Amino acid sequence: MARIELAPEIAEDFDRILNHLASHDVEYAGQRVAGIISALNILEHNPLIGRPVANAKRELIIGRRGQGHVALYRYVPEIDAVFVLAIRSQREAGYPERDSEA
C-alpha cells in the first residue's frame, strides 16, 4: 500500500477551490473537498491509475463535468510513495507555478 504525501501548497489549492465554491454559492462545499480527499485515497492501492503526463508525473481525474478536479502527482515505486503536487478544477488551464515541484 503506497504512502500518500501532500505538498504544502495543496492547502492553497483547497483554499482556492473553497473560495471559488463560496463565490458561486455552492452548497455542500465541504463535501466536495471531502470527495477530493476520498478520491486521492484511491492512490494508496492503485498509484498508477492516473494518466501519465510529462516528467514522470501523473494526473488523477476526480469527479466529472463542472464539478471535476485534476490532481497532479508523482509515484515513486522505490519507496512506494505518492506525492500529490497540485489540485485544480478541470476547467482551469494548467497548474499554479511552483518552485518546489519535483
Please name every model-derived segment:
Residues M1-E59, R64, E78, E101-A102:
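Basic, Lys/Arg-enriched alpha-helical interface segments
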